[in-house]
């Protein structure tokens, strides 16, 4: 079976998880990887084959991937970064027509996850607490509507890029009001919850881990925690994201008082997924089981208290 990871970048851990799970299923799996510059992608170097594709914003991106999937009989396509999610979600039917299942949520869940303003609105409408949020324009008009301290975030940003922690509203006047939202800044323990939905849209598992240390927006030290209140929030996600599918993750703050606020949703594999995988929630195995039509082993059974400490590794190759 052929599996393709797009925008593979540094997702070597994802390749390793798929290989480990394919071996446990006795499944011959060939992993392909695609990137804008695959020669400088560590994950592409680890894959069985790699391919150069246009940037996901290019009009040739989808036709190129369709051609690649058709020629190599790709059964499963796994997108790795946020910008390609709405594009691939919108073209799921075209890929399905050639026998390729795209591991991505439906357009609504993707749209909600990619707009922090909409994320806050949908969470509140579903009864899930989130920090009080205003558009930058509304905040500048009436900053006292939010309790300080506050944090300004790009509406569609990721990896903690572009975040501003202002001391006053005046410090935000140079930002584009259309591009930013402003939230009350909660202090507390930060968690990510990795969540898995099967192809029928049923949520099967939720694995919280505490983010002990973060680097460039991705957890570098973390530990799995059984947290009933956080898990209860996770199991309410299907009501908020009716067309969710595959892996998702969300981030939350837990105050010392026990209050919980969700402030971000990612409709893809989270960077900290290897911790959930090692703890006994192999989303990658469950995706392979779905692809080959065998009975799923998906279950909400995993180890609490498992710690992950990350370090840098290198890939070497001759020119």
Q: What do these predicted regions represent?
A:
Residues 1-34, 72-73, 199-201, 242, ...:
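Preference for protein termini
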Residues 1-103:
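ATP-binding N-terminal substructure of ATP-dependent carboxylate-amine bond-forming enzymes
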Residues 72, 228-319:
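ATP-dependent carboxylate activation and anion-phosphoryl transfer catalytic cores
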Residues 107-189, 199-202, 228-232:
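Active-site nucleotide/adenylate-binding loops and adjacent lid/helix of ATP-dependent enzymes
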Residues 160, 212-218, 222, 266-280:
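Glycine-rich phosphate/pyrophosphate-binding beta-alpha loops
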Residues 162-244, 249, 253-261:
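Phosphate-binding site of ATP-dependent enzymes
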């Amino acid at each position: 079976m052929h599996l393709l990871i797009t925008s593979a970048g540094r997702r070597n851990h994802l390749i390793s998880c798929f290989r480990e799970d394919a071996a446990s299923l006795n499944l011959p799996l060939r992993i392909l990887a695609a990137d804008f510059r695959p020669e400088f992608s560590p994950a592409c170097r680890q894959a069985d084959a790699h391919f150069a594709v246009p940037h996901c914003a290019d009009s040739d991106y989808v036709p190129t991937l369709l051609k690649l999937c058709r020629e190599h009989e790709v059964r499963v396509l796994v997108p790795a970064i946020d910008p390609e999610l709405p594009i691939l979600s919108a073209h799921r039917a075209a890929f399905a027509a050639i026998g390729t299942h795209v591991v991505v949520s439906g357009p609504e869940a993707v749209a909600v996850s990619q707009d922090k303003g909409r994320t806050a609105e949908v969470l509140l409408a579903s009864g899930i607490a989130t920090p009080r949020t205003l558009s930058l324009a509304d905040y500048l008009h009436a900053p006292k509507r939010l309790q300080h301290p506050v944090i300004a975030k790009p509406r569609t940003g990721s990896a903690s890029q572009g975040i501003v922690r202002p001391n006053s509203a005046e410090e935000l006047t140079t930002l584009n009001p259309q591009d930013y939202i402003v939230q009350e800044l909660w202090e507390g323990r930060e968690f990510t919850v990795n969540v898995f939905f099967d192809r029928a849209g049923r949520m099967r598992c939720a694995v919280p881990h505490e983010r002990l240390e973060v680097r460039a927006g991705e957890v570098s030290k973390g530990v799995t925690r059984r947290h009933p209140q956080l898990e209860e929030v996770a199991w309410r996600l299907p009501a908020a994201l009716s067309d969710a599918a595959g892996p998702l993750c969300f981030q939350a703050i837990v105050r010392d008082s026990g209050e919980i606020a969700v402030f971000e949703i990612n409709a893809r594999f989270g960077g900290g997924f290897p911790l959930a995988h090692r703890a006994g929630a192999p989303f990658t195995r469950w995706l392979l089981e779905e692809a080959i039509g065998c009975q799923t082993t998906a279950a909400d059974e995993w180890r609490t208290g498992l710690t992950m400490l990350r370090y840098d590794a290198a890939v070497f190759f001759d020119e």
